[in-house]
Amino acid sequence: MKGMILFISCILLIGIVVECKEGYLMDHEGCKLSCFIRPSGYCGRECAIKKGSSGYCAWPACYCYGLPNWVKVWERATNRCGKK
């Protein structure tokens, strides 16, 4: 029983320590990466290129899970899309 509690505690701790980022990928202009007219699987491939665990087309932009912290994702607060 103590072993099971220790195992579960370790799993929870690992989940807290190894945090991964998720969000919308950005293009070179700071806009969400569009998938509106892209083929099936496009977003999954783009997320994999950025070392993400998975991704999908959250119409009309690519959304990724499990991204490393160095990948920039679109955020409403820092949105620079279409601004100069």
Swiss-Prot record:
Belongs to the long (4 C-C) scorpion toxin superfamily. Sodium channel inhibitor family. Beta subfamily. Has the structural arrangement of an alpha-helix connected to antiparallel beta-sheets by disulfide bonds (CS-alpha/beta). Residues 1-20 form the signal peptide. Negative results: does not produce significant modification of hNav1.1/SCN1A and hNav1.6/SCN8A currents. It is found in: Secreted. Beta toxins modify sodium channel function in two ways: an excitatory effect (shifting the activation process to more negative potential) and/or a depressant effect (reducing the peak current). At concentration of 500 nM this toxin produces channel opening at more negative potentials in hNav1.2/SCN2A and hNav1.3/SCN3A, which shows the biggest effect. On the other hand the peak current is decreased in hNav1.4/SCN4A and hNav1.5/SCN5A channels, without apparent modification of the activation gate. This toxin is active against mammals. Expressed by the venom gland. It comes from Tityus trivittatus (Argentinean scorpion). Residues 21-82 form the LCN-type CS-alpha/beta domain. SMART domains: Knot1 (SM00505). GO terms for cellular component: extracellular region. This is Beta-mammal Tt1g. Disulfide bonds join C31-C81, C35-C57, C43-C62, C47-C64. Keywords: Amidation, Disulfide bond, Ion channel impairing toxin, Neurotoxin, Secreted, Signal, Toxin, Voltage-gated sodium channel impairing toxin.
